[in-house]
Amino acid sequence: MKKWQLFGTTAIGASLLLGACGGGGNADSGKGEGEVKGDGSSTVGPIIEKLNEKFAKDNKDVTVSSGTSGTGGGFEKFISGSTDFSNASRPIKDEEKKKLDDKGIKYDEFKIAQDGVTITVNKDNDFVDELTKEQLKEIYSGKAKTWKDVNPKWPSKEIKAYSPDQSHGTYDFFTEEVMDKGDIKAEKNADTNVIVQSVQKNEQGIGYFGYNFYEQNKDKLKEVKVKDDSGKTTEPTKKTIQDGSYALSRPLYIYTNEKKLKDNKGFQDFMKFVLEDKGKSAEDAGFVALPKKDYTEQQSKLDDIIGKDSKKDDDKDSK
């Protein structure tokens, strides 16, 4: 029987711990065992949860846990060596790479899904249908105090801007893509659900977060189209997010500790499952799968990292 246990890790989430059920065995017979620990992005968290649910069915001797302390918080734990993998909604930063290098930790990057940072306003807002990146920058830099400051045709009502806090990869992505690395002046919160609720309650509210959060709350919020640098206006949909035509599309990642991956058959089995799933769990969680060839290419990359011995074990196990 599958067991679920929740352990609070931060204000924004909890660690999901799954004791798997199904086939038996140990490392010698080709089956993994033991613990696999992760942490990181609250955006990626629901995908890992869906993957764990499926993986648990055939891997009773492997326990996978994953916290949601944010991309930055996840990397801190990854750098300290307390986790085997780190979930991220942005690429690893140079300073994080350096810290890993200083500790002699080799890591590998895997893309597992595609997301689109979605801009939303209050459901009763009847004038904001689209925004340029420059207008978003004016709002989130504090330069535009009222909607009229953004567009002379809009009402002179004070804007209430909401944002994830600095622990989120979504914050870093927005800072990079929209703010040109400038400061965000908005009411920040570690809990994305609080941002959703704030925009819902405030008629002059505006907020941003991952596409799946919008999908879960689209009956409560109004989505805003984004005009890219070429002047093309696009709304976030599964198609525009996957093909990258939506201006705020981004990949979602799992970073793995290479030594721990090589030493832990259960970890290897989990990562193989992640890639063999080919984005089905991401779609189940409201995200967008990568093109199938991307998963196939990364499966080859994983095989190269793990080595031929692991592949032989799998061949034995399947006979």
UniProtKB/Swiss-Prot annotation:
Region span, Disordered: 25-44, 61-98, 297-319
Positions with biased composition (Polar residues): 80-89
Location of the protein in the cell: Cell membrane
Any one biological process term the GO annotation gives: phosphate ion transport
The keyword Signal appears for this protein: yes
Lipid metabolism found in the keyword field: no
Lipid group attachment sites (N-palmitoyl cysteine): 21
GO cellular component: plasma membrane
Leader peptide range in chain numbering: 1-20
Pfam family, one: PBP_like_2
Assigned keywords, A-Z: Cell membrane, Lipoprotein, Membrane, Palmitate, Phosphate transport, Signal, Transport
Entry's Gene Ontology molecular function annotations: phosphate ion binding
Gene3D superfamilies the record matches: Periplasmic binding protein-like II (3.40.190.10)
Lipidation (S-diacylglycerol cysteine): 21
Assembly and binders: The complex is composed of two ATP-binding proteins (PstB), two transmembrane proteins (PstC and PstA) and a solute-binding protein (PstS).
Its biological purpose: Part of the ABC transporter complex PstSACB involved in phosphate import.
Family note: Belongs to the PstS family.
The protein's name: Phosphate-binding protein PstS
Originating organism: Staphylococcus saprophyticus subsp. saprophyticus (strain ATCC 15305 / DSM 20229 / NCIMB 8711 / NCTC 7292 / S-41)
Gene: pstS
